[in-house]
Amino acid sequence: MKAEIIAVGTEILTGQIVNTNAQFLSEKLAEIGVDVYFQTAVGDNEVRLLSLLEIASQRSSLVILTGGLGPTEDDLTKQTLAKFLGKALVFDPQAQEKLDIFFALRPDYARTPNNERQAQIVEGAIPLPNETGLAVGGKLEVDGVTYVVLPGPPSELKPMVLNQLLPKLMTGSKLYSRVLRFFGIGESQLVTILADLIDNQIDPTLAPYAKTGEVTLRLSTKASSQEEANQALDILENQILDCQTFEGISLRDFCYGYGEETSLASIVVEELKRQGKTIAAAESLTAGLFQATVANFSGASSIFKGGFVTYSLEEKSRMLDIPAKNLEEHGVVSEFTAQKMAEQARSKTQSDFGISLTGVAGPDSLEGHPVGTVFIGLAQEQGTEVIKVNIGGRSRADVRHIAVMHAFNLVRKALLSD
């Protein structure tokens, strides 16, 4: 089924409201295996809507119109659709009864002829009751094309779609998706590596999305059951993860989790809990962002003992007992400083892990290091590891955010190696 969504309303074209209905409908239709090919917005104008209906009827098998079902003069969606199909408007008894009750309970409200429009549907249509409003929707098939009219307010449209429309559109297959999350590899490199899979995809499909500091891959397939979908998605996932970077590194090393809501931080916090281990932090450029991120998760007190925010050289020396002369000799942005910060954070809190971040957030360089230079240290019983990352060409906020992601990834790898 090839679907098209037509949003009716001049206020959409003038930017007075955002057309969130199209996004909601596209998402829900995809979940039941209906592909949306076109989204269009048109003003409250009969001539232009008639023209658009003519185009839609030639290229789509499902045409959904949203908005324009109200009582005002510019609410003309049902009237225009009826004219296009050569049909009359008739009253839906249930909607008319609801309208009668509404005005009976509000004797001060004036009931005008325009109000009656809300209880009308195109002749032959299946009514779609409105749970939260007065304007009834409808579904009608003519010459192989299914037409649907829905109210514009999201509070009315959403329950009508979920409870009335989708059950009537259900087919034998649904769309199932799986999201893979990658860190440490850019979107362009990932897309290049997966070029053959992307170019030759039919079903299942994969689509990359770049986010701040990471990349996600959405794998989707149409299937009649979750079990059938899992089989197809498992095959595609393994094909993806078996690929290697140009340096010969498996993509499995970059894939850290699944799902829309998963994050590096959530993975690390849960793994620390599972292993019964604790962590402490000493932060300079990130000014407590790592610690605040850990504290966002419930039960963080079981794995997070505490930490230090040591922005200046003096505080690094005073709070972490690192000799000032050594800091001056090596610089606050250095492998040495990151190592000592991590080790002292671990030692002073008696934690299993000590993590440190020191670097240049910008906008100016520091100690000869360009903006985006970050040293991250991880101290544990086996020793201390320090990595240097370059997060160039980013805003100050992004440098700090991505630096924290690198820190969580370093901890994640250490936990996996235990």
UniProtKB/Swiss-Prot annotation:
PANTHER family: NICOTINAMIDE-NUCLEOTIDE AMIDOHYDROLASE PNCC, NMN AMIDOHYDROLASE-LIKE PROTEIN YFAY. This is Putative competence-damage inducible protein. Belongs to the CinA family. Disulfide bonds: none annotated. It comes from the Bacteria. The lineage of its organism: Bacteria, Bacillati, Bacillota, Bacilli, Lactobacillales. Gene3D superfamilies: 3.30.70.2860, CinA-like (3.90.950.20), MoaB/Mog-like domain (3.40.980.10). The gene is cinA. InterPro entries: CinA, CinA-like_C, CinA_C, CinA_KH, Competence-induced_CinA, MoaB/Mog-like_dom_sf, MoaB/Mog_dom.
